[in-house]
Amino acid sequence: MTAPLELEQIRKAPKALLHDHLDGGLRPSTVLDIAGQTGYDGLPATDVEELATWFRTRSHSGSLERYLEPFSHTVAVMQTPEALHRVAYECVEDLAEDSVVYAEIRFAPELHINRGMSFDEIVDAVLAGFADGEKACAAAGRPIVVRLLVTAMRHAAVSREIAELAIRWRDKGVVGFDIAGAEAGNPPTRHLEAFDYMRDHNARFTIHAGEAFGLPSIHEAIAFCGADRLGHGVRIVDDIDVLADGPDKGKVRLGRLANILRDKRIPLELCPSSNVQTGAVKSIADHPFDLLARTRFRVTVNTDNRLMSDTYMSREMHRLVQAFGYGWSDLERFTINAMKSAFIPFDERLAIIDEVIKPRYAVLIG
């Protein structure tokens, strides 16, 4: 019997990340540094370890709404070009250190205007941080490609403006659009104008759906909004039955929505640890990730918010390995799923799969 993969082994594997929030992945030390530099005095702790613990425990709240509350502190220290550049640069460094070779990072420009920056200045600062981080990592022998998704908050009314922002920057590092925030009372159909604008410009978008809210959210995101991917989408399990008895015991039966999702190969940006924190699932072992993977949905592994969940890609993969016994071939499949689903051109996706991911996994598999 093959020994289970250890965390340090998984660290060596190339990874592709599709769902990670810039304002949810700051280093605790950076939060403290920028707070001191900018005069923000609202932090709940002044010690690095205490602050990290506060973010983790406060985010383990059991609901999406309470999970989102700690973001007020990270957003508060991301209100200058210098702060945004630093956070973006360090994001690239941290991902590359974890052997991530491709990442799409998202954030909501509308949350960073408190000190007078325009949306374009905000995006420019983040992309400059990404570019400088990529150069530094390449020079250090850890090449990585990082692209940006601009997010509109679903409770606000600027989604069309953010969609226009995505198109203005589409050839400079922005590869798509997203809506995020509390799902309850904020259906994706409120933002049809933004999604129509993206389609009119042949652009890609993902939608947070099926995280805290159920099947109606997923149905609207796919049927009415035309999402290319689903942020989370974990509640699609509500449309899947595993027969408990009879001659077909154990057989999986999909409802119509689940069938459409699988048939159209719509990627699921699954974030296991985050889903436990928000109460979407009780534990990693209870997460429907394995059911969805075995049923051949296009599942991907993601971090969501590295600071709030005290996580990183290797840890997310290791937790899935511990829960479901996955081996190298499984992790390779999930990684290729993510790379196939990226919002960069086909030839660029294929090059990373064929020239980076497959060769490095071939060495690991042996």
From Swiss-Prot:
Its cofactor is Zn(2+). Binds 1 zinc ion per subunit. One of its GO terms (cellular component) is cytosol. Its EC number is 3.5.4.4. Substrate binds at residues 21, 23, 181. One of its GO terms (biological process) is purine ribonucleoside monophosphate biosynthetic process. Zn(2+) binds at residues 19, 21, 208, 304. It catalyses: adenosine + H2O + H(+) = inosine + NH4(+); 2'-deoxyadenosine + H2O + H(+) = 2'-deoxyinosine + NH4(+). It comes from the Bacteria. Catalyzes the hydrolytic deamination of adenosine and 2-deoxyadenosine. This is Adenosine deaminase. The gene is add.
